[in-house]
């Protein structure tokens, strides 16, 4: 029996409550507690799938992984009596996997988007459309937020509650192509964004600090000195004029005009004040570590050389992409299997 924990979103459970009428089979939602929930705040940053993707390191890692995965062609093969194989081009599933997954949905785009779903939320879903012979003729992508896996207490059967634009229905497991990421219960995967939420929030906080750092022309670059005492009204007038003329990005580089024997002495930014730059670099590496993406693939060439980039790229395909290819291949063989394929 699977752990009974709360659903990814209370609204979704509310939408599905009518499906579990009195007398229905007792069931439990099979949902991961490690996911980003609406309104989640961490380090003063609102963190969800949308805001996390606005962090450049997250976008770059997911982008390169999803595009690289989708760029590799997917073919359906038929086993022959002599043990060899050939492409099963006459099978409807061949075109679904290789060319067009559904109306207005190229196979490339289906793979790319579903891989993004796995890399962000930990799970990707598509509904199988079958013909009269039971062959898969379409794969209709489902948004993970609209799918709630559940398990029957008595039989252990997995099924899926789906909310399609307000239309609620159940689908048996054999009608769903479900690609989970790394998980703990054998059904669903952890959300990578949720697992990396502290690293992401720290990176986003450092970006916010950088925005504020430069918002008013960065930190003070110098001080005004005078040998004459200033009265309160003169001091207030000086502050107001200085802010109006020299603060802000639009006034950056303006020529400073001083009066009354005042002098401007430049000061440098101390290491503590500039530390956020190092924090931003480290957080980029931290996100790349979560996704096992070499830094040069997300445009960070600081530690790369001509000789090691080639080896890093080979390692990327062997240690990062190959597990994804195997995962998809085996789940598709299990869930899209046809007798002659």
Region spans (language model):
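Residue-level detector of conserved catalytic or cofactor/ligand-binding positions
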Residues: 334-341
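Short amphipathic alpha-helical segments at helix boundaries and their inter-helical linkers
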Residues: 303-319
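Conserved nucleotide- and phosphate/pyrophosphate-binding catalytic cores
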Residues: 317-318, 322, 333
């Amino acid at each position: 029996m699977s752990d009974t924990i709360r659903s990814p979103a209370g609204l979704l459970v509310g939408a599905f409550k009518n499906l579990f009428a009195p007398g229905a089979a007792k069931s439990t939602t099979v949902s991961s507690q490690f996911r980003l929930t609406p309104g989640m705040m961490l380090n003063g940053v609102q963190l969800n799938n949308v805001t996390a993707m606005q962090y450049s390191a997250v976008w770059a890692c997911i982008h390169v992984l999803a595009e690289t995965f989708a760029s590799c062609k997917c073919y359906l093969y038929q086993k022959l009596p002599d043990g060899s194989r050939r492409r099963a081009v006459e099978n409807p599933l061949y075109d679904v996997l290789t060319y067009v997954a559904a109306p207005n949905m190229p196979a490339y785009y289906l793979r790319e988007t579903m891989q993004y779903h796995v890399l962000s939320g930990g799970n990707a879903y598509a509904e199988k459309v079958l013909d009269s012979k039971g062959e898969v003729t379409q794969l209709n992508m489902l948004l993970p937020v609209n799918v709630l896996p559940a398990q029957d207490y008595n039989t252990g059967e997995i099924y899926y509650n789906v909310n399609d634009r307000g239309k609620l229905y159940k689908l048996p497991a054999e009608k769903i192509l479900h690609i989970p990421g790394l998980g703990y219960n054998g059904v669903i995967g952890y959300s990578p964004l949720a697992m990396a939420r502290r690293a992401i929030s720290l990176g986003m906080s450092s970006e916010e600090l950088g925005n504020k750092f430069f918002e008013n022309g960065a930190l003070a670059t110098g001080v005004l000195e005078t040998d004459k005492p200033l009265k309160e009204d003169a001091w207030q007038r000086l502050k107001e004029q200085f802010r109006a003329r020299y603060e802000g990005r639009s006034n950056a580089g303006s020529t400073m005009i001083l009066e009354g024997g005042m002098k401007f002495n430049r000061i440098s930014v101390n290491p503590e004040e500039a530390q956020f730059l190092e924090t931003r670099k480290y957080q980029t590496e931290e996100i790349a570590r979560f996704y096992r993406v070499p830094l040069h693939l997300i445009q960070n060439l600081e530690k790369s050389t001509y000789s090691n980039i080639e080896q890093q790229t080979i390692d990327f395909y062997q240690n990062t992409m190959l597990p994804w290819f195997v995962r998809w291949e085996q789940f598709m063989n299990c869930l899209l299997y046809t007798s002659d394929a």
